[in-house]
């Protein structure tokens, strides 16, 4: 059984000039219970390279992690991790070119993100990729003679690079997953900064909020040039993480997933444009303290997912998790957040703009980050509110300021319960803030394949000018909460559609194996009659409008 002394003393090192090769499509794995340093070359073309830690007895690990340390997966400045694809071609007896054009491989440093749960399997080691290091998971191409098409340039997609740590991320190297050529997609970059459970006696150093900062360009490496794992002892900061938009675009990535069990903060003006997908998992999204007040953040992809994190329980009897999950900032709102999906935009779990957390048993230092003054979520197709991934509570999208939701149609997914709140102050709604619903085209799209969902929209002022649907479910606009929390005005604008009708909708919905119990997604279905309520208190079906004033304009349905 490994001891704390072994964790501190054992090292795995691949030195400068060392080269490890495996056959194309095969794997290289290097793990250590202590420090892991790579300054050589690892070649697994079209295969997999994994750098990680080794699990030890929980009683040993808990004590070590509670004290804090500087052990890391350190990818040094001369390191090359190459899983880029190489096409293999030959010529047959008739002079025709044939071959295999495989896609880029996979590099995993520390762990990976599980998109179904919003949890990362991260290492209890810092992840450090020094400037000069190169991680390459690009695709390939080859000229082949295809039957019926003749000479054709065939290209493959880029692979995947995943970096995950429970401690901190220092990402100054080069990450590449280019498309192999025209017609093929770029690869995927996944970056995760997780927050584990610590003993409640843990040192203040480890009980820090995790904050993954996204900036436009590099503001200078936080570690001095020439640093070594030994030289930075005591210099690595728990909760540190930084990634630049330049790194993403220069790497040729078409898919980006970011996870922070705490904050994803934007440092000034940032623009991220992905060719396929963008997924953000966090306790809150906000602006850094150094970001200028008029900062503008633009996030664009065909598919966008905004989600919370799965590991968000704060404590047990003897364990604490120093995480930040939303909260109302004490600072004024600032800047603009614009999120646009050309196909589909999904919202899941608890999505918060702005954050605040006081110093506590779990969190050694309080933290406060500004919410966006204006948030625009736009989908040229559907905007879906999905059921939470881990528990039975509702999905929630919350901001202190104005919120605009614009899509072809907006609806909860099957069985999902979701709530959207603008102007949140922790008490009554901010009377100066508005929740606006809009549409991207004048024609109504076909009914979504969704039933029995529930969606509530809350703000002091609600302007409904879009297409809101919840077939055979419930839609609730406004809150009649008396003096402390009430909607003042609901405006149903011309061309708006607010509907729970399922007329003409045909879709599969579960089944029965015994002729008695009907199940959907493995669970027994609870069907409520008209006017019934769920255990959460939400109406099971129908449209509810609650507010001090209701204004229904011509052509609102």
Predicted features along the sequence, with ranges:
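Extracellular and secretory-pathway beta-repeat/beta-biased strand scaffolds
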Residues: 1-557
């Amino acid at each position: 059984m490994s001891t704390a002394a072994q964790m501190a003393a054992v090292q795995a090192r691949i030195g400068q000039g060392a080269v490890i090769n495996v056959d194309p499509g095969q794997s290289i794995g290097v793990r250590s219970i202590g420090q892991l340093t790579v300054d050589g070359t690892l070649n697994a073309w079209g295969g997999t390279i994994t750098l990680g830690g080794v699990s030890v007895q929980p009683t040993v690990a808990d004590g070590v992690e509670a004290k804090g340390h500087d052990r890391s997966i350190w990818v040094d400045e001369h390191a090359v991790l190459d899983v880029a694809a190489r096409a293999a071609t030959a010529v047959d007896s008739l002079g025709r070119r044939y071959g295999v054009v495989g896609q880029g491989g996979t590099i995993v440093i520390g762990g990976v993100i599980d998109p179904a749960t919003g949890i990362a399997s991260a290492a209890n080691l810092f992840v450090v990729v020094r400037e000069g290091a190169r991680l390459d998971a690009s695709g390939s191409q080859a000229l082949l003679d295809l039957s019926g098409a003749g000479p054709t340039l065939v290209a493959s997609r880029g692979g995947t690079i995943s970096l995950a740590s429970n401690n901190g991320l220092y990402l100054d190297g080069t990450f590449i997953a280019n498309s192999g050529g025209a017609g093929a997609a770029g690869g995927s970059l996944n970056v995760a900064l997780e927050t584990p459970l610590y003993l409640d006696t843990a040192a203040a150093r480890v009980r820090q909020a995790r904050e993954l900062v996204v900036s436009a360009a590099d503001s200078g490496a936080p570690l001095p040039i020439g640093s070594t794992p030994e030289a930075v002892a005591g210099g690595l900061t728990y909760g540190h993480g930084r990634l630049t938009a330049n790194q993403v675009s220069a790497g040729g990535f078409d898919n980006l997933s970011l996870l922070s069990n705490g904050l994803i903060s934007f440092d000034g003006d940032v623009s991220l444009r992905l060719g396929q997908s963008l997924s953000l998992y966090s306790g809150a999204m906000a602006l850094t303290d150094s970001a200028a007040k008029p900062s503008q953040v633009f996030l664009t992809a065909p598919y966008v997912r905004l989600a919370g994190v799965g590991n968000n329980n704060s404590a047990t009897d003897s364990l604490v998790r120093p995480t930040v999950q939303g909260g109302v900032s004490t600072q004024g709102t600032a800047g603009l957040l614009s999120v646009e999906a050309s196909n589909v935009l999904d919202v899941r779990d608890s999505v918060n703009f702005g954050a605040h957390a006081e110093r506590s048993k779990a969190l050694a230092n309080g933290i406060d980050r500004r919410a966006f003054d204006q948030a625009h979520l736009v989908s040229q197709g559907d905007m879906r509110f999905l059921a939470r991934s881990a528990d039975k509570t509702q999905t929630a999208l919350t901001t202190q300021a104005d919120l605009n939701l614009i899509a072809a149609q907006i609806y909860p997914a099957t069985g999902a319960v979701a709530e959207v709140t603008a102007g949140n102050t922790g008490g009554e709604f901010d009377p100066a803030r508005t929740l606006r619903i809009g549409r991207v085209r004048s024609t109504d799209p076909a009914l979504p394949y969704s039933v029995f969902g529930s969606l509530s929209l809350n703000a002091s002022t609600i302007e409904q000018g879009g297409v809101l649907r919840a077939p055979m479910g419930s839609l609730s606009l406004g809150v009649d909460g008396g003096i402390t929390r009430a909607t003042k005005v609901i405006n149903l604008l011309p061309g708006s559609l607010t509907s729970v009708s399922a007329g003409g909708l045909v879709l599969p919905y579960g089944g029965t194996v015994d002729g008695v119990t009907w199940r959907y997604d493995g669970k027994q279905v609870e069907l409520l009659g008209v006017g019934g309520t769920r255990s959460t208190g939400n109406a099971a079906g129908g449209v509810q409008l609650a507010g001090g004033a209701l204004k229904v304009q011509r052509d609102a349905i």
